Amino acid sequence: MNKKSIRDIDVKGKRVFTRVDFNVPLEDGKITDDTRIRAALPTIKHLVDGGAKVILASHMGRPKGEKNPEFSLAPVVARLSELLGKDIKLVEEAYGPVAEEAVSKLEEGDVIVLENVRFYPGETKNDPELAEGFAKLADVFVNDAFGAAHRAHASTEGIAHHVETAVAGLLIEKELQVLGKALSNPDRPFTAIIGGSKVADKIGVIDHLLDIVDTLIIGGGLSYTFLKAQGYEVGTSLLEVDKIEQAKEFMKKAEDKGVKFLMPVDCVITKEFGEETYVGSRDIDSIPADHMSLDIGPKTVELYAEAIKASKLVVWNGPMGVFELDKYANGTKGVAQALADSDAYSIIGGGDSAAAAEKFGLADKMSHISTGGGASLEFMEGKALPGVEALNDK
């Protein structure tokens, strides 16, 4: 990683504005998964131990640029206080006189949390005035919100232009090291598994990965567009007619580059979306015209598991089927299990794949689970991440 991190600077006595990703799922005001809070702890502890005055900033949900108690960071602050074993204060404002006063009272090793940065319309517009308002609170800017690093917002990118020292936190440092090595100097054989519902969302990723991988595995809703491109009938399965030509181009590119391109050989079908009309598995050339597929079948799981077993590095992004419904979860579970059982270094690209690994109790068997869905996707497309680009070079 060619960007400075908190390991490269002295933070003692400094006001450190740290952008974290505390955008956690809530139900009735209670946190249902605190993974993102825990992921920020190493950076927070490093700063506290180094004698910094720590100012944490994050977004939560999409409050559309206005204050909404439903999206307050209060539940996060309560959980963070428990995890750190110290009383942490929530500041009602994220910038301006109230925030400035709270910061002025900080002692070395203290931690405060500013209220949701998306309560201000300038945040998502990367408004320079708001960015300057954040910068007024800080001597140092630390970005540790990998989940928001692909967005050029006031608290992720804008602020970096108004402070002298802007560095990465430990989480972003690790993400960039792991993903960066996979894309620039991968252990081989290198296999990528791409699932999810739409080809449109994964065009950049598939295109970029075909330049690097030895094997590309396709699953999930987007596989039916590829199967259709090969001449199979896919019934009422998810299909992007306008992406069939693109799918053909990808298969041609794989052939030209000598990349093994694996697609489903069987699938799990149903008459209608849901578990009531579940039929079971069928070979890929036997999908009835009035049925749809919602998962890969057992033969495909076996085929994919063999490819995973033969790999030294596997990147997985996107589920193999509608894993939220048990009858269509076996494909995703099978792939997750194969990864858990293999000796390969496994990188799970955030979002649904991470949720699936969690659901099947296999998360701790994966080598690296990325904390950024969109960010890891854009990084795998070879795109620069604004929240990283703005940091100081080494």
Swiss-Prot record:
Keyword Kinase in annotation: yes
Cellular location(s): Cytoplasm
CDD domains: Phosphoglycerate_kinase
GO cellular component terms, A-Z: cytosol
Binding residue positions for ATP: K202, E324, G350, G351, D352, S353
InterPro entries on file: Phosphoglycerate_kinase, Phosphoglycerate_kinase_N, Phosphoglycerate_kinase_sf
Matching Pfam families: PGK
Catalytic reaction equation(s): (2R)-3-phosphoglycerate + ATP = (2R)-3-phospho-glyceroyl phosphate + ADP
Molecular-function GO terms, alphabetical: ADP binding; ATP binding; phosphoglycerate kinase activity
Keywords for this protein: ATP-binding, Cytoplasm, Glycolysis, Kinase, Nucleotide-binding, Transferase
UniProt entry tagged with the keyword rRNA-binding: no
Gene Ontology BP terms: gluconeogenesis; glycolytic process
Residues that, per the record, bind substrate: D21, F22, N23, R36, H59, M60, G61, R62, R118, R151
This protein's pathway: Carbohydrate degradation; glycolysis; pyruvate from D-glyceraldehyde 3-phosphate: step 2/5
UniProt-recorded name of the protein: Phosphoglycerate kinase
Source species: Exiguobacterium sibiricum (strain DSM 17290 / CCUG 55495 / CIP 109462 / JCM 13490 / 255-15)
Encoding gene, per UniProt annotation: pgk
